[in-house]
């Protein structure tokens, strides 16, 4: 077991009940283009086209051969683009059950399948995009390979579902997915979990590792740091546990599996719980009559790293397993800094709220202050469990010093790895955005 002591479990109200329920009927689904780092689409459909489930919607011209497929059958009703014609989303009005089918196999055949057969089926179905590289967090090139694949079979994000509930419901598919991953690499498959019991693969290159401690103990970046540190030469891939199930379902049934169990939770959700929906589901449909009155912000993903789901982005993200909802914090409190703050959370124990152990807080979207200078008072070190100098690294990200940032470990990181640093920052800096700018520059300059 690997135990980390630094980190932070956010005490936010609205914890979901850990029972899986059926979600609302979904009328629209979408693929969100901006989720895929560096992707430049070549469109295969236009508005008005009828599509089958698993039909190709677009390919990536910067990563030749990588296909992005429809999560449901229906009619393309929107192709939304932003500044500089960046693809925001392809929206499908759900209708019918037609789907593209693929080869299916017996469970005993999976570990012996040829690697090219596996790659071809994953690419054609669109499931290849479930894999992400580290560094850079991009969809792997089809001809690339890795010696380490990390399966994130735990989740320490605030308000998250317990993965063991979902995995144990789909044990056969999960084991089949691990068998597929084991055949996809000449190295090891690291299944990273909490102390719970999960179905195990019989393949010799599949290892289980237990992590314990506060968030970010459940992040792929934390697991890689301790088990297979990445750099420009050592490239690892990561995948979440629900996509491992989808891999198994694809090869066992010959059909694309797009079901997703998500946590619908937060301080303004009427009945926080786990709901079964589909990848790309309209969050307007999913949250209909589920929220308390007032102005709220629906977030696809965690409250720490998710995206504001509004307009062309109001859909469940490809890599997200949560829908979090917060109240918009627009009210201003006179002399709020001088109040005892019984109902306020503070990492630095600035408010009385820290005295009441176990208290959950109705957090909002407010940043509790305006932008200001970066102040190194030890906050970053409290929440960074990785063996690096967070204050120096964050300073270099602010200054745009890519050489120094790379030397301090920036290539190991993804935006989610710096989310707690953003949360505890007195200067209100968005370190995830700064990290992405740094990584883009490093990749561009080689």
Swiss-Prot record:
Q: Function, please?
A: NQR complex catalyzes the reduction of ubiquinone-1 to ubiquinol by two successive reactions, coupled with the transport of Na(+) ions from the cytoplasm to the periplasm. NqrA to NqrE are probably involved in the second step, the conversion of ubisemiquinone to ubiquinol.
Q: What does it catalyze? A: a ubiquinone + n Na(+)(in) + NADH + H(+) = a ubiquinol + n Na(+)(out) + NAD(+)
Q: Which organism is it from?
A: Vibrio alginolyticus
Q: Which InterPro entries match?
A: NqrA (IPR008703), NQRA_2nd (IPR056148), NqrA_C_domain (IPR022615), NQRA_N (IPR056147)
One GO BP annotation here?
A: sodium ion transport
Query: What name appears for this protein in its UniProt entry?
Result: Na(+)-translocating NADH-quinone reductase subunit A
Q: Which UniProt keywords apply?
A: Ion transport, NAD, Sodium, Sodium transport, Translocase, Transport, Ubiquinone
Protein origin, superkingdom: Bacteria
One example GO MF annotation: oxidoreductase activity, acting on NAD(P)H, quinone or similar compound as acceptor
User: Quaternary form?
Assistant: Composed of six subunits; NqrA, NqrB, NqrC, NqrD, NqrE and NqrF.
As for family, the record states:
Belongs to the NqrA family.
Known NCBIfam families for this protein?
nqrA, PRK05352.1-2
Q: Name one Pfam family in it.
A: NQRA_2nd
Known EC number? 7.2.1.1
The residues forming the signal peptide are: none
Summarize the activity regulation.
Answer: This reaction is tightly coupled to the Na(+) pumping activity and specifically requires Na(+) for activity. Inhibited by korormicin and 2-N-heptyl-4-hydroxyquinoline N-oxide (HQNO).
């Amino acid at each position: 077991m690997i135990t980390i002591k630094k980190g932070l479990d956010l005490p936010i109200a609205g914890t979901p009940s850990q029972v899986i329920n059926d979600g609302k009927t979904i009328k629209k689904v979408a693929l969100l283009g901006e989720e895929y780092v560096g992707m430049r689409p070549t469109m295969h459909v236009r508005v008005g086209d009828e599509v089958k489930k698993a039909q190709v919607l677009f390919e990536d011209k910067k990563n030749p051969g990588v296909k992005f497929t429809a999560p449901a059958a229906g009619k393309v009703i929107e192709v939304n683009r932003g500044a500089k014609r960046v693809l925001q989303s392809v929206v499908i009005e759900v209708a019918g059950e037609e789907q593209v089918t693929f080869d299916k196999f017996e469970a005993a055949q999976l570990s012996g399948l040829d690697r090219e057969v596996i790659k071809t089926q994953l690419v054609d179905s669109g499931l290849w995009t479930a894999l992400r590289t580290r560094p850079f967090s991009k969809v792997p090139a089809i001809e690339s390979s890795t010696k380490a694949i990390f399966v994130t079979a735990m989740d320490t994000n605030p308000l998250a579902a317990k993965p063991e509930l979902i995995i144990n419901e789909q044990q056969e598919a999960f084991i089949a997915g691990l068998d597929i991953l084991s055949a996809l690499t000449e190295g090891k498959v690291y299944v990273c979990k909490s102390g719970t019991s999960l179905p195990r693969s019989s393949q010799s290159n599949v290892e289980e590792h237990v992590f314990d401690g506060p968030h970010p103990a459940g992040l792929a970046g934390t697991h890689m740091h301790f088990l297979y540190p990445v750099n420009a030469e050592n490239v690892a891939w990561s995948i979440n546990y629900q996509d491992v199930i989808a891999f198994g379902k694809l090869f066992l049934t010959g059909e694309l599996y797009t079901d997703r169990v998500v946590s619908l939770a937060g301080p303004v959700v009427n009945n926080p719980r786990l709901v079964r929906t589909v990848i790309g589901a309209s969050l307007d449909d999913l949250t209909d009559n589920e929220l308390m009155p007032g102005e709220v912000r629906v977030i696809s993903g965690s409250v720490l790293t998710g995206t504001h789901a509004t307009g062309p982005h109001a859909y469940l993200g490809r890599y997200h397993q949560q829908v979090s909802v917060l109240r918009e914090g627009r009210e201003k409190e006179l002399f709020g800094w001088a109040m005892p703050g019984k109902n306020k959370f503070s990492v630095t124990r600035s408010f009385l709220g820290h005295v009441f152990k176990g208290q959950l807080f109705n957090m909002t979207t407010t940043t509790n202050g305006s932008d200001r200078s970066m102040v190194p008072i030890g906050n970053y070190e409290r929440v960074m469990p990785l063996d690096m100098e967070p204050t120096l690294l964050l300073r270099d990200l602010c200054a745009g010093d890519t050489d120094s940032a790379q030397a301090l470990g920036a290539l190991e990181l993804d935006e989610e790895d710096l989310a707690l640093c953003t949360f505890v920052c007195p200067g209100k800096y968005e370190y995830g955005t700064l990290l992405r700018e740094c990584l883009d520059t490093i990749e561009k300059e080689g």
